[in-house]
Every structure is written in C-alpha cells, then in structure tokens.
Amino acid sequence: MGSTSSLYAAIDLGSNSFHMLVVREVAGSIQTLTRIKRKVRLAAGLNSENALSNEAMERGWQCLRLFAERLQDIPPSQIRVVATATLRLAVNAGDFIAKAQEILGCPVQVISGEEEARLIYQGVAHTTGGADQRLVVDIGGASTELVTGTGAQTTSLFSLSMGCVTWLERYFADRNLGQENFDAAEKAAREVLRPVADELRYHGWKVCVGASGTVQALQEIMMAQGMDERITLEKLQQLKQRAIHCGRLEELEIDGLTLERALVFPSGLAILIAIFTELNIQCMTLAGGALREGLVYGMLHLAVEQDIRSRTLRNIQRRFMIDIDQAQRVAKVAANFFDQVENEWHLEAISRDLLISACQLHEIGLSVDFKQAPQHAAYLVRNLDLPGFTPAQKKLLATLLLNQTNPIDLSSLHQQNAVPPRVAEQLCRLLRLAIIFASRRRDDLVPEMTLKANHELLTLTLPQGWLTQHPLGKEIIDQESQWQSYVHWPLEVH
C-alpha cells in the first residue's frame, strides 16, 4: 500500500469530455503520472426536456469503466469525482450518477457553477505564473466560468449557461461556417455576458488567463504557425475568417488544429470573441491548470505560492543538484547587465524574469555530462514540467541554455515565439557574458563592470589592468567577441 498512498486522482465529468488526472505528491508539489481524456459529448445527448439520451449515458459509463481500472490502486479518500454543467441540468442525472458511482466505487459530486468556478481559479492560482490580479476564463461544453481574483482569493465568480457543445448544437447545427452562424453565436454569447460584465470590470485584472480546450486549441494553432502565444482579438478574427473560408464544419482545416478539437472549435471561438469584445480584453494566455488541478491541490491542502515560477525553479535546482550559489551569482551579474541596457534596448520586465530563470537553470546539463552540457540543458528544460512557465517560455529558456556558450545558433533563437527574435538575441548575449564573468565561482572575483548599449553595439568596460592580470579571462573574452561577431553582434571590451 505504501507506494500508492501518495497517489491522488481527480475526475471531471464535463459536458464535452471526461478527464482523469492521477498525480503523486512529491515534496509539496505534484508529479503527473496519468492524464486520460475521452470525448463523451454528454451535452449533445440532452433533448429539449433536458433528459439525457441512453446513448449519451452509455458513452459516459463506458469511459468510466476505463477510469475505474486505474482507480483500484488509489485510497478512496484520495479520489475526487465531480460532475459539471450537463449533469447539473439533466433531469435524469440521478440515473447516470447512481451507475457511475457503482462503476467507480466512489462518490460522484455534482458541483454548482460557482464551486466549479472557484476550483478552476484554484487550479490556475497553483500552476500559472504572471501578475497576481487575474481574470480566468474557462469555456466548457455547456457552461462558461469567469472568475476574477488576487493571489489565492477570488473576488467574483460567475458560471454562465453557454458552452462549446450547446452553442454548436444551437448555432452551427446545419454544420455551415457562415458569417451569419458566427454573428448569431456571438450575439447570443454577448447577451449572456452583459449582466455580469460590469461586476467583472469593477474588480479588474492585470492578466487574463484561459483554461479550456478552446484556448488550448488556439495555443496549438499559434505554435504551429510560428506566432507568439498571446491570444488577441485580431488573431481570433483572423481565425474566424479562415473558418468562414472553409465553409463547412467537416471541411474545417487550420494548421495546428487537431481533428479531435475541430468539431467544437468554431462555437468555442464565437464565445471567446464575444468575451473579448464585451469585456474589452487586450490579450489572453493559456493557464497551466484548471478544475482537475484545483481538486488535487484542494485534497493536498497546499498553500498557493505567491511566485509559482520561483517554486518551480527551486524544485528543479534541488532535483538536479544544481549549485544554487553559482546560479544566484550568474543571475546577479545578468540582472546588473540587464538593468544597464534595458532603456536603450526597450526591454520589458518579463524578459528580465526569463533571463534570471535561464541563469537559475543554466548548469542543469552538468547533471547529465560536462560534454554537450548546453544540449543536455536545452533537452531537459524543453521536456520538464515547469509550472508557471508557458510552453513558449519553456522553448525560449531551452534555446537560451542551448546557446549559453560555444558558437551561436541564430536560427534557434528565431524559432522560439515567447519574445521577438531580436529580444531573444539580446537576452542570449547578456546570459553568455554573465556566465563568463561569474565562472570563477566566487563573489569577490566578479569584477566591477559597466555595460553600455548603442543600438546593437555592446561596450563592456572592465577595471583598469583586469585583462592583463587575467590572461585566461582575456582569452575567453576574445573568443566570445569573435563568436558574437560571427552573428553580427558587435562587442567591444576595454
């Protein structure tokens, strides 16, 4: 029993999909062991009297039989099963739930829309970096949750009865992707939103985070098409035009959109456009977790960390036995360089955070081998679970670590989409210099330096006589100037 007592499972019986998440608690954080998702499309089985069809219920039970096999090894007190919008609505939900409990061998709780919204917010708060004050949007199959909050506390919670399955059945039933279908779907969504918009705006937010299949699909499309990961109204409108151009739902083809997500994508897109328009949202990013993560963290009674990225970096440093003092030393030098050039280069605060994060992890490759350490570092960072970092930010960190020393691979810096290519180049230059000047691994051996930027020219001024007194240091700096010059990054050292 010992090896299973640290296992926890969260099951979400959604209106579009059923999901199961199995995790292991490791030193106050969670390690994902299993994620299973099945498209059950329960909401599509509701008739005009809100009764679930036998076929829809059978699809659900069939899925739960798969889940039940995995649950046998987990203590019942460490399993939570919740049902959302469709089972709140269905007049025969009792029949479905009775059999579901029999199959799973544990209670199934039908949660209110507000409780669902609260759990979604907790899942986001535990797994998503960025500003403290946030608006969270989750478009489900039959309901949409909108939550504002600061840190771990929610300030307003709304669960609205519109979702990508119900809007599909209502506004895209003819399977046409016409302008009029989108217009009707958006208009209806805006009417549902209007009564709650004022209160959401009153509480306000600094960042907007999306936590649903629709937003996940958008992220996958944008990554596949090499765009940056920020979702904007302009991008949503472009995708709508692309969908209209395809004409029919069965002919919908967009680079990066999987067949599995395509069916409910137009309806989800229409709802999201309405949310952006009605709430005047400038940009949205993808959340690291939502309802299932909220359930798991709730069972574990873990406090929400103020800075999720810092917790992630600490855990990784411990796990891979990174020299934390050295990581801090490099980070301090890099931060000093960044502060000296940020105005000339018009760098944003998030770029500073990502540079410091790269410094904290730059020696992770040594845990594999000194040979090709940068390649090992890039591989590890690209493939590790890093709560608080978006997929594009992970890719940027991996690219910076790949280019921390040796000749520079410019194309890799241009293939990431977390920041503009020029910014990635600038962060890479600062990281490389910081690693060089902290390489003696002692604070008292880091020289006092000034770094000036004039367009792309960097001028580094060292203490009088430093280059003469440090012949190896001079050789390393000369080599670095040469490597940077190969990719047209002028560097002068005095």
Swiss-Prot record:
It comes from the Bacteria. GO terms for molecular function: guanosine-5'-triphosphate,3'-diphosphate diphosphatase activity. Its EC number is 3.6.1.40. InterPro entries: ATPase_NBD, GppA/Ppx_hydrolase, Guo-5TP_3DP_PyrP, Ppx_GppA_C, Ppx_GppA_N, PyroPPase_GppA_Ppx. It holds the Pfam family Ppx-GppA_III. The keyword Ribosomal protein does not apply. Keywords: Hydrolase. The keyword Hydrolase applies. GO terms for biological process: guanosine pentaphosphate catabolic process; guanosine tetraphosphate biosynthetic process; nucleobase-containing small molecule interconversion. Pathway: Purine metabolism; ppGpp biosynthesis; ppGpp from GTP: step 2/2. It catalyses: guanosine 3'-diphosphate 5'-triphosphate + H2O = guanosine 3',5'-bis(diphosphate) + phosphate + H(+). Belongs to the GppA/Ppx family. GppA subfamily. PANTHER family: EXOPOLYPHOSPHATASE, RETROGRADE REGULATION PROTEIN 2. Catalyzes the conversion of pppGpp to ppGpp. Guanosine pentaphosphate (pppGpp) is a cytoplasmic signaling molecule which together with ppGpp controls the 'stringent response', an adaptive process that allows bacteria to respond to amino acid starvation, resulting in the coordinated regulation of numerous cellular activities. This is Guanosine-5'-triphosphate,3'-diphosphate pyrophosphatase. It comes from Escherichia fergusonii (strain ATCC 35469 / DSM 13698 / CCUG 18766 / IAM 14443 / JCM 21226 / LMG 7866 / NBRC 102419 / NCTC 12128 / CDC 0568-73). The lineage of its organism: Bacteria, Pseudomonadati, Pseudomonadota, Gammaproteobacteria, Enterobacterales.
